[in-house]
Structure formats: C-alpha cells, structure tokens
Amino acid sequence: MPTDIFSFKRFDIDQTGCAMRVGTDGVLLGAWAGEDPAGSIPQHCLDIGTGTGLIALMLAQRFPQARVQGIEIDPIAAECARANAAASPFSDRIVIASGDILDSSLESLIGNQRFDLIVSNPPFFKSSLHAPDRQRTMARHEETLPLEKLICRASELLSPQGRLALITPRDRLKDLRLYAATYRLVSSRLTEVRTLPHKEPKRILSEWRPADTAIDRSPFTDTLIIHPATGYYSPEYVRLTEPFYTTSFRILAVG
C-alpha cells in the first residue's frame, strides 16, 4: 500500500485522503514551468487545480520572491494543500483557495491580481465511464474543468507578459492550439515527453503567452526523454528534478 507521505528535499506532501497522488506529470510541470532564457522571473503564480499543493510548493521553492496561489475544487484536497503549504518553509508566500476557478465568486479571492505564471495539470479523461469515487472523478475527468474553459479563464488572468504552462496528453495539442488561438494566446515552448527513446510521446509540456505582447517567432520545441535506457535517467530529466527528489539517480549520458 503506498505511503501517504511523499518527501522531497525541502518539503513533504501529505496525500492522506487525496484522490490524485504525487506523480511524474505534476513533478515535471512544477520543474519545467516558468523557465525563461531571457531571465524573467515570475512574481505572482497561480496553480489551477492544485490538488495536494505539489506544484505550488515547487514554484515557491524555485522562485524565492514569488507569491503563489493555488485553487482547488475538491475541498478535501484543498485542505490537504493548505496543510502541506503551512508545514513548508514557504508558508508565508503560498495561499490555497477552495473553489471552482470558473466561478466568478472567486474574484473575491483573486481580486484584480494578474499572474506572471499560471500552471495547471488539468484532468483529461473524456470518457463517460467515470470512476465510482466522486472525488477521483473530479480529479481525473475533464467535465470538472474542460480544457477550453481552462484556457479561456487563464487568458483572463494572465498579466500582459504572463505565461500559461500546462502538461496534457500529446493528442490534445491540436485542441490546445485551437483554443489558444480563440483566446489570443500563442505557443512559446513545447516539450514532448517520452518515457523511453523508442516510445511515442504520451505527454506534452506547453507554454502559452498573450498574442498581443508575444514576440513573433516560432515556439522553442524539444523532447525530454526520461529513461534513455531501462533503469537509467537522462541528464536532462535529472537537471529538472534533482532540486526536488531526495533519491540519487543512475545517469546514462546520451550521445
């Protein structure tokens, strides 16, 4: 039976009672989001669907001057995230709200704040075959946060130079591009994630900026291979995640 405590280098995640546990998708997004070759550092971050608070805590660790807000529709998970944030070294910079990001009443919590960085590891199952556990259904099925509505809401909350970072199934990229164009966002970074070199990418990390202020250029694209060979990790994966994981890595250099 999996433990309810997942320990990172600088904070712990207590997952007790939470539908979605710590996983590779969340860790990758928390480590990847907000990287900017130009050196821009986000000051105000928003994690939509924060769950246990994992990504919010990762952002607080990476950006020591940033204030981070997490929003979670599941009240049990929201309380879990609050406890995890309160127990962390970053407690004075993290606020967790319980509610639906699509609900206009959340304006009372967000106010006029606009965010330099918005992140989300959204639910993505579209099948009508829902999990029997309502809490798990909210965490995993898109009906609670449709991708188009997420992008629409994020576009309203981004600052002019802000960035929206997502991790989604690779096969949703066409939808992402359509919805982004509808709400005047353009792609600035795309990273395909492969577990092994010969495997097709199942996930994509994507970053989007407001079209009105984005530099007119093609997005930076690359591929992240997690395991160049069975039992080993790539240097790129280690670079992203080593600041967080307490375990040591067996590294196999590629090339």
UniProtKB/Swiss-Prot annotation:
Query: What cellular component terms from Gene Ontology apply here?
Result: cytoplasm
EC number of the protein: 2.1.1.223
Q: What class of enzyme is it?
A: transferase
Q: Which UniProt keywords apply?
A: Cytoplasm, Methyltransferase, S-adenosyl-L-methionine, Transferase, tRNA processing
Cellular compartment(s): Cytoplasm
Q: Name the reaction it catalyses.
A: adenosine(37) in tRNA1(Val) + S-adenosyl-L-methionine = N(6)-methyladenosine(37) in tRNA1(Val) + S-adenosyl-L-homocysteine + H(+)
Tell me a Gene Ontology molecular-function term this record carries.
Answer: tRNA (adenine-N6)-methyltransferase activity
Q: Superkingdom of the source?
A: Bacteria
Q: Does the keyword Transferase apply?
A: yes
Output the InterPro entries linked to this UniProt entry: DNA_methylase_N6_adenine_CS (IPR002052), SAM-dependent_MTases_sf (IPR029063), Small_mtfrase_dom (IPR007848), tRNA_Adenine-N(6)_MTase (IPR050210), tRNA_adenine-N6_MeTrfase (IPR022882)
Biological process terms from the Gene Ontology for this record are: methylation; tRNA processing
In the record, the note on similarity to other proteins reads: Belongs to the methyltransferase superfamily. tRNA (adenine-N(6)-)-methyltransferase family.
Q: What is its biological role?
A: Specifically methylates the adenine in position 37 of tRNA(1)(Val) (anticodon cmo5UAC).
UniProt-listed PANTHER family = TRNA1(VAL) (ADENINE(37)-N6)-METHYLTRANSFERASE
The name of this protein is tRNA1(Val) (adenine(37)-N6)-methyltransferase
| Organism of derivation | Porphyromonas gingivalis (strain ATCC 33277 / DSM 20709 / CIP 103683 / JCM 12257 / NCTC 11834 / 2561)
